[in-house]
């Protein structure tokens, strides 16, 4: 179920404050955040946000096509190592 339009997008207030500070200071350092639930706003375009995936912070460069998505969509939490190979016994 999607979020009601009358409520607007959810973004943690500390993330917006850090983004505004980075834009005014023209700071290129990644903004560290644990807020995977925050929606990407148009003000974030051009910033690099380091999103926590449970183990480390994954740097995500924000482009215009990402607006409206959640930050957690771009920092994967699980790594797929492939299915194990079949170990069939060969009779001689």
Swiss-Prot record:
Pfam families tied to this protein: Ribosomal_S19
HAMAP family: Ribosomal_uS19
General function of this protein: Protein S19 forms a complex with S13 that binds strongly to the 16S ribosomal RNA.
Segments forming a coiled coil: none
Highest taxon of the lineage: Bacteria
Matching NCBIfam families: rpsS_bact (TIGR01050)
GO molecular function term, any single one: structural constituent of ribosome
CC per GO annotation: cytoplasm; small ribosomal subunit
Protein name: Small ribosomal subunit protein uS19
A single BP term in Gene Ontology: translation
